[in-house]
């Protein structure tokens, strides 16, 4: 079975082609550099980028997979959550392709794609705990099967990737700021140590975001030199430690010793290090599948319907 999958939930335009659970091609187009002047996502602009890029991505995916359109058996697309305008572009494109090819068109939850992404091209190991940490969400799930995914906790305000970008911007880093925070991280300089909230509470990142933005803005107002390494390292360590504490709580609560990590924050080196200390079995997606991509949407479709 050949699956054409489409992902347009935020600013990445992605088209993939799979043969069952095997990825034949996955094209990702992103115009994030053009968003630098705005310091982040502008929904109307990224929706327009999707319109400009989606046919190009499809053409490249077909070329790379050596598959023709008339061989496609199913079309899968991201339908939620995400930016409404971006999702709309992907949905209309997917439904148009499915209608033209006379095949079934199936909506897939973007988060479920991230949850299953560590197992792309392989077989999931159920049950497992899943953390999705990205610019749009920060949630922990108990995954019993591809069709039995239970949300244990989520962020009540900002997502971790979102505060990475906002604090990173204040430190002078381009969007997305996560890679720069990771690059300049020095644990010996992480000397700013706010207290942690009760572990049973839902995630909340707005308070820590505001605390570090206040530190940065205070230095700017006093014309003091901003110690980007100390502030960035302290901010990153606190944010990651907050997640690790929450994971430990649910690990003990449900006696699950396998964890899967999805979303862009999975690329962070300090985070990977701490995860390996906590869980005996951990899975992260390949780097090319750790951010938004259509391969995970096609793979999620396959797992839910095999």
Curated annotation (Swiss-Prot):
Record-listed substrate binding positions: 132-136, 165, 178, 182, 268
Pfam families xref list: TsaD
Gene3D superfamilies assigned: 3.30.420.40
The entry's keywords: Acyltransferase, Cytoplasm, Iron, Metal-binding, Transferase, tRNA processing
Major location category of this protein: cytoplasm
N-terminal signal peptide: none
Chain ranges passing through the membrane: none
SUPFAM superfamilies (UniProt xref): Actin-like ATPase domain
Source domain of life: Bacteria
Cofactor note: Binds 1 Fe(2+) ion per subunit.
Enzyme class: transferase
Cofactor(s) needed by this chain: Fe(2+)
EC number: 2.3.1.234
Reaction catalysed by this enzyme: L-threonylcarbamoyladenylate + adenosine(37) in tRNA = N(6)-L-threonylcarbamoyladenosine(37) in tRNA + AMP + H(+)
InterPro entries (UniProt xref): ATPase_NBD (IPR043129), Gcp-like_dom (IPR000905), KAE1/TsaD (IPR017861), TsaD (IPR022450)
Record: residues binding Fe cation: 110, 114, 292
A single BP term in Gene Ontology: tRNA threonylcarbamoyladenosine modification
Cell compartment(s), UniProt: Cytoplasm
One GO CC term on file: cytoplasm
Molecular function per GO: iron ion binding; N(6)-L-threonylcarbamoyladenine synthase activity
Annotated family: Belongs to the KAE1 / TsaD family.
Free-text function comment from the UniProt entry: Required for the formation of a threonylcarbamoyl group on adenosine at position 37 (t(6)A37) in tRNAs that read codons beginning with adenine. Is involved in the transfer of the threonylcarbamoyl moiety of threonylcarbamoyl-AMP (TC-AMP) to the N6 group of A37, together with TsaE and TsaB. TsaD likely plays a direct catalytic role in this reaction.
Protein name: tRNA N6-adenosine threonylcarbamoyltransferase
Organism of this sequence: Malacoplasma penetrans (strain HF-2)
Phylogenetic classification of the source organism: Bacteria, Bacillati, Mycoplasmatota, Mycoplasmoidales, Mycoplasmoidaceae
């Amino acid at each position: 079975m050949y699956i054409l999958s489409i992902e347009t939930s935020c600013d990445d335009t992605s088209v993939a082609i799979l043969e069952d659970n095997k990825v034949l091609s996955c094209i990702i187009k992103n115009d994030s550099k053009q968003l630098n002047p705005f310091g982040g996502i502008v929904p109307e602009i990224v929706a327009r980028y999707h319109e400009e890029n989606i046919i190009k991505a499809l053409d490249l995916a077909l070329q790379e997979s050596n598959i023709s359109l008339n061989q496609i058996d199913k079309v899968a697309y991201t339908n939620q959550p995400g930016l409404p305008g971006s999702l709309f572009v992907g949905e209309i494109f997917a439904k148009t392709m499915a209608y033209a090819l006379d095949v079934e068109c199936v909506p897939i939850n973007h988060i479920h794609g991230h949850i299953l992404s560590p197992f792309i091209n392989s077989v999931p190991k159920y049950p497992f705990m899943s953390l999705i940490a990205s610019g749009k969400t920060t949630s922990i799930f108990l995954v019993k099967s591809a069709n039995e995914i239970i949300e244990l906790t989520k962020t009540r305000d900002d997502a971790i990737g979102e505060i990475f970008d906002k604090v990173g911007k204040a430190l002078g880093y381009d969007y997305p700021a996560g890679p720069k925070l990771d690059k300049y991280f020095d644990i010996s300089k992480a000397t700013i140590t706010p207290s942690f909230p009760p572990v049973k509470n839902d995630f909340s990142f707005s308070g820590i975001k505001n605390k570090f933005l206040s530190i940065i803005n205070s230095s700017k107002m006093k014309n003091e030199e901003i110690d980007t390494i100390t502030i960035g390292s302290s901010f990153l360590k606190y944010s990651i430690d907050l997640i690790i504490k929450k994971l430990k709580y649910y690990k003990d609560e449900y006696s699950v010793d396998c964890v899967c990590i999805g979303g862009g924050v999975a690329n962070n080196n300090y985070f990977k290090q701490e995860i390996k200390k906590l869980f005996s079995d951990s899975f992260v997606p390949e780097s090319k599948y750790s951010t938004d991509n259509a391969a995970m949407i096609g793979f999620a479709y396959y797992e839910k319907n095999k």
